[in-house]
Amino acid sequence: QIDADRLALRRKIEESLGRLEKETLISRNGENYFFLTNEERDINKEIKAVDVPGGEESRLLGSIVFEDVLKGARKHRYSANKMDFDFNRRCDNYPIGNQRDGGLLFSLITPLSDDYDAYDKAKCILDSTAEGGHILARLGNDESLGRELRTYLQTEKYVAHKNDGTLIESTKRILRDCAEDNRQRRDRLTVLLGEMVAAAEFFVAGQPLKIKAVSPEMVLWEAMEYLVKNSFTKMSFLKKLTPEADRLKEIQSILRSNDIAKEQLLFQKGEVNPEALEDLRGYVDLSSRHPPPLVPHALIETRYSIPPHAWPDAAIP
């Protein structure tokens, strides 16, 4: 009974504080509330009136997740062979940062999306098969997320616009306080979104994925490992990868030496990847029976550098 009374009292207090905040009589920063002076009230009313166009909140959320929480990661190094894979980032279908041709994809669906409720398990599974298969992460809902993001954007815009060097000292102080509150707000958002990413539902290339990792960065690593492994199923045909510079240097040296024995040895070395050679021979044999003729450069770009192969150019036998 005591706990129930406390919960009821807490709800009443929160409702009262919410009304005072809505009327701009108090200001909120996290779990702290402050009564406002007349000038502070006027400024806070102006901040609340700042327009935030559609999509800006999702772009900010995506920027915080991918740049702050995930430390700006744009590549994944696959553990089995140390190959690097670029990946693109999206948040509620808005691109975050430059998009790289041929990159993998990590798509984030958040409560800010108009279609959030439509992303049930079946839709998440289906959508994750698009574009050759990608990572789709659906964040859980948190009632403070949208409010904090919107307040952050409104405050940032207002302070930047208002700071023109002609303000009286009391107004400058209020704006400095607003900017400091916003810095703390972004820190809170980074922590909150880190927790939300770690707890998100993940779907990869048409399969729900139960993530074992607990930190956001390791969650990303685990999802990327699964995506690469299941997208590039013939990548394992390359048992040995020779660094491109070393391979070219070796070939040039042997050809210049005009040593037939060494040349024969060079070609024998190619057999360290017999499955890859067999795959290539089979495709070349099949293609040679039908026009148009094969072009090596096009062969690499249209077949062996994309799923299911992802073979480095220099490693193609």
Name these PLM-found stretches.
Residues 1-317:
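Extended alpha-helical interface modules used as scaffolds for assembling large macromolecular complexes
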